[in-house]
Amino acid sequence: MSNNSLYYIYIDTKIKGAFEQLIRYFQSQVFNNKDCISVFCKYYKEIEHLAVEVFNKHNITFKFIKKNSDLSFIKGKIVFYLFNAQSNCRVVANRDLIHVFVTHGESHKLASVKPIIRIYDYVITSGDVGVDRYLKSGIFTQYDINNGKVLKLGDTFIGSNIFKYESNSHSLVYAPTWEGGVPEENYCSISMSIAKNIDKFCKKNNIKKIFIQPHPNLGHRDAKYRYYLNECIDFFF
């Protein structure tokens, strides 16, 4: 264990794309190996092989959590959370630690304003838009904001892709989100009607090429969305 050891990261998810999102935080130095004591990862058979492969590849210390007694923390340290999960509540119950919800991305979706966010000592947001979102939803009050419950961290965008802007390009990128963890949080735009509108737009604007980059979680809750995606791809061809 390094002398720099400051915090833990707790992750509870069966979604394989979540590990790619976590690694990007390390690659962009939001987190780093020296300061991170360990990533505590709730054990699921579905993600066991991937988690071992990813964490070992990037030299990140980790531990699978199969039962509550597997959790062991140094008093006074920080625990960061990137995803909301019921098991987070058990960890947050340890008041010898400081609990910070980072999220893995902000948006105006319902998932960004769930009441469970109140359980953490601090919540990270990018800026005033995020603060306003919490105030309007009633998750936090102005008193909470004034007393530092919500911390503005600035632009922490860590996404990466293969695309770059060219003013003379005749290409279009379509990057639909996934269907969400529950039907009420479904903001996915994949459908034949959308595909036809994209095709019409491309023809009108002399766009010759379409790049499609779906959300890594697409089809996790409802596999038919992968079928919808393939249907749209076939249509474009």
PLM region spans:
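Short helix-capping segments at alpha-helix termini
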Residues: 141-145, 203-205, 234-236
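Short, flexible, solvent-exposed loop/turn segments with mixed acidic/basic and small polar residues
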Residues: 1, 27, 111-113
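Active-site and donor-binding regions of nucleotide-sugar-utilizing enzymes
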Residues: 10-20, 38-159
